[in-house]
């Protein structure tokens, strides 16, 4: 065997654990779920499974509960995504200052992301927010009472539950802040100085220089936030369980109920692939729009 052949064999050997894991836990289940989406597979009675073709997908088009869950999810995304993008950018601008102890503040802002990412962390965070939203002795209503405002029902209100869960999503704002911060620290100082010498004020420098130069970071955060928002599950499952009155029945929660409450795995698989198609379509639209507002260094604006 030649030296190149041995090197290739060693490379495949090191690659094989990942490849086997990918086939067993990602590609394999995806193929199985795609096949199941064309059947009426029932978990409790797998022997009665029959091929229904596109029946599950046609059923989804006429499902009013699915339409409701999609509206709830899109409303949540419309609130949570802009809030994370704006607050993350504001925090990054503040924490980009050259001041003593700033590294400690940056760590403090990012720490909630690490907690939520730990094993069971997202459930623990959801339980913490359940206390924060508690109408009688929760933190939010206590803060409102300090400024003379009436208490709110928060997640126990059909009107406020989705905005409350969007507020809860800001627990992870440290992730977008960190990406913005990395982009801000790579800004060419000569361009900023040139804008200042030309008489541009702070707002004009931010809008005309800083924001275009960090637009790739904004684009990256937008794509991630959109995908995460469409797949929101833990908050609604732990905090509200879809209530009150299905007002927080997110798409993923409805999918979960079909799979593990009603045991209708065929229909649940179809819902999963429809969500994949929706996420892919929205992501493609964002990528298309990026041509007109994302600036890459060394290229014309929007390319």
Q: Model features per residue range: what roles?
A:
Residues 1-6:
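Short, Lys/Arg-rich, polar N-terminal cytosolic tail immediately upstream
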Residues 7-303:
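A structural signal for multi-pass alpha-helical bundles of membrane permease subunits
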């Amino acid at each position: 065997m030649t030296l190149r052949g041995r090197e290739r064999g060693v490379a495949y050997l090191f690659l094989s654990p990942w490849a086997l894991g990918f086939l067993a836990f990602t590609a394999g289940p995806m193929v199985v779920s795609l096949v199941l989406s064309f059947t009426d597979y029932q978990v409790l009675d797998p022997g009665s499974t029959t091929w229904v073709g596109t029946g599950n997908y046609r059923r989804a088009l006429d499902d009013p509960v699915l339409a409701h869950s999609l509206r709830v999810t899109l409303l949540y995304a419309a609130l949570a995504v802009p809030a994370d993008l704006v607050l993350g950018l504001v925090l990054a601008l503040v924490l980009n200052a050259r001041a003593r102890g700033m590294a400690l503040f940056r760590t403090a802002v990012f720490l909630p992301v690490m907690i939520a990412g730990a094993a069971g962390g997202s459930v623990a965070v959801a339980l913490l927010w359940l206390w924060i939203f508690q109408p009688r002795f929760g933190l939010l209503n206590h803060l409102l009472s300090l400024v003379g405002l009436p208490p709110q029902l928060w997640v126990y209100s059909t009107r406020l539950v989705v905005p409350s869960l969007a507020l809860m999503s800001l627990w992870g704002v440290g992730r977008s802040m960190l990406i913005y911060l990395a982009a801000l620290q790579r800004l060419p100082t000569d361009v900023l100085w040139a804008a200042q010498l030309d008489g541009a004020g702070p707002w004009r420098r931010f809008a005309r220089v800083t924001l275009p130069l960090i637009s790739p970071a904004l684009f990256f955060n937008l794509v991630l936030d959109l995908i995460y928002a469409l797949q929101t599950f833990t908050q609604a499952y732990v905090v509200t369980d879809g209530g009150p009155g299905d007002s927080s029945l997110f798409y993923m929660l409805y999918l979960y109920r079909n799979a593990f409450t009603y045991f209708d795995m065929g229909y649940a698989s179809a819902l999963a692939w429809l969500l994949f198609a929706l996420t892919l379509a929205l992501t493609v639209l964002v990528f298309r729009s990026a041509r007109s507002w994302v600036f890459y260094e060394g290229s014309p604006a929007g390319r």
